[in-house]
Amino acid sequence: MEESAGGSNQTILARRGTMSEQRTNSLSYHITAVKKGERVFENAFQGVSRMILEGEIDKVMVNGKNTFDFRIFRKGPKHIVGMYDEINSFVSFIKDASEGGSSAEMAFVLVGEPGNGKTFLVEYLCKLYRRFLSVPVNRRYTFRFVGLDKLGSYGNITTIESQTYEDPLILAMNLEESRDESGAHLARRYRIDRKMLEKWFENYRPLGACSAYIWNNIREYTGGKFDDMLEFIEIVPVPLVESLGTVTGKYPAKDKITSSAVDLLGEESIQRLLHITDTNNPYRFDLRRGALARVAGGGIHFSDEIYKNKKDLVQVYLGIIQNRCIEIDGYKWPIDTLIVATSNNSEFNRFLAEKEEAPIVDRCRICYVSHNTNHVLQKELTAYAIGNEAKTTLTGDVMHQDPNLNYAASVGVVLTRLPRSEKLTPIETMKLAAGEVAGEKSLKTLSEVIDTLSQEHDITKRFGQKGLGQRNLGRTIQLMLESSETNEGKCMFAYDVFNAFERVILDYVAEAKDRAKFLEDLKIAKGLYRERIMTEMFNAYMDEPLAIRKDVLNYVNMIIGIDAENLGADKMWKYKNPQTGELQALKIDERYINSVEDCLGLKTREQKDSFRTSIRKIYGQKISVRPDYDFMDNLELVKAVTDVRLKSDIAGSGSLIGALANRTNEENQKLYDRMIETMLNKLGYCTTCAQKTIEYFCTQVDEN
């Protein structure tokens, strides 16, 4: 009888063992899946690093220096614009941490002016990470203890999930009482080779206090029988719901009275104490009441305005950043979390002034975030500020957007962000920062200016660190939209943006010195807008959207062909168009070439030859990389060509202004009507902005 009873017990245990092997939510199934590569086991740094580096990587030139552009940050309708240096610093930090470098014991802190995209960058990263983890092979798993009513000391609590979302492999590496025994057990039971085991154990950490305590209770209850112990374990995926704060969680700085360490770490739970009979059980602490435990299983913790927190909270962060561990009353819960934080310059400087707080800064990798200084990229950011929805007036009519609005706003806001320099004028700095041509000045000059400014101890004096931010740009657009002129005309007229900028500068910029500089920058921006309107008027006059572009390219092709060997007496030159690949013929007009160069102020033969050489050099450099390059960023050349064409066609720009301003005779009225028609049908204007633009063109204000 005893033998048969013993035999039947063995059969039951064997069956139970095979059941635990077969269950898809069993630990054995999970270990086998990781072994086969169907699931992954990696820490937070390795996960984020893999997510970024598996995407495409481009090489780009930024402010005269080569850098990398990670394509993953450029996807989606509202993606990250610019921020090349900041993203490169972050990727380097993550990569170092994922390889076990010193970054693993640090937090990454973005410091900069308000409204320059720090929070947006971190939230975008969190969104990418959640999407990355939603792919089945990348999904995070944790474990829970079931059937706890059998143990007797947990009251009505039957199921307990790992409070810090520990990975099932962390449990696997702590199955036995010592690390070595657990490793030997895994190798023996699951036939895991030494190399894979070593790789897993690189991410070894002990179980959190409550998981270890419960696991020990289970061991005592089952008498250490491994198959029986596994029956108490269930593997579950970590929820990816953003609003739960799991995997990616944000902790914004609160006021000094209501905030406490409980918000980060958790606290003793009265509800749990009603059930747990053993007062030594660490499960009496509810860790998920705090923000950290919810992201402790390979997540990202985002601390917004970290240095605004009161001192005792900063001290809590100090321990967490260094030790990667939640500690309450001597109990410890190791965590696997990437900590990213933000701070504005003034709060950071105030914090640095308090010397006793130095240790926390010592444990942070500080990255100074500048405003976007590339006016071409700014067009995307300005489009974000304007919004992609169709605008309406206060009375519900459709609101039109001036085709020059984005350019005017982008140039206006970028110029305020560029520091003054003796080596470069503001316009030269702006053009070089966007990778455009700035006369004789090269990107090397811009690099030197940036390097000199980066020596400044005061961060706000560095390149791009001070200026009107994205929020101020948003306010500017709001002021435009609420004005009566905009609503009555049913159009966001581009020139009105400068009046709105002026209002924002006067109302929101605190320092008088900054206000004076920004207002000066606004005058320069108006001059650039004026030059753009000259071009637009010429295109409208010629009844062709790209008339000026054709004439600029004609000038460039003429100075290339003027020295050609196969140039006949008829001055006809045949060349291959790099954009279309077709063979084209062009008559070289030396009078036209000389007129353009005279307009540029080039009087002597040497000056003209030097200018032509520089244009040919730019052509050689740009066309090989960008066959569609059109020299329209060379504002001086565009202005000269516009002036020459207007003079040759209607005896000077002054005459066009005169004709448009004085419409008493029939001929002038016909010209005005024809230009309005072209602007409406071909150039994207509405009646309001077309009339206002011509009116502005006739005033001759803002000429640089």
Regions found by a protein language model. Name each.
Residues 1-7:
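Iron-associated oxidoreductase/ferritin-like identity signal
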Residues 11-14, 18-704:
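Conserved ASCE/P-loop NTPase catalytic core
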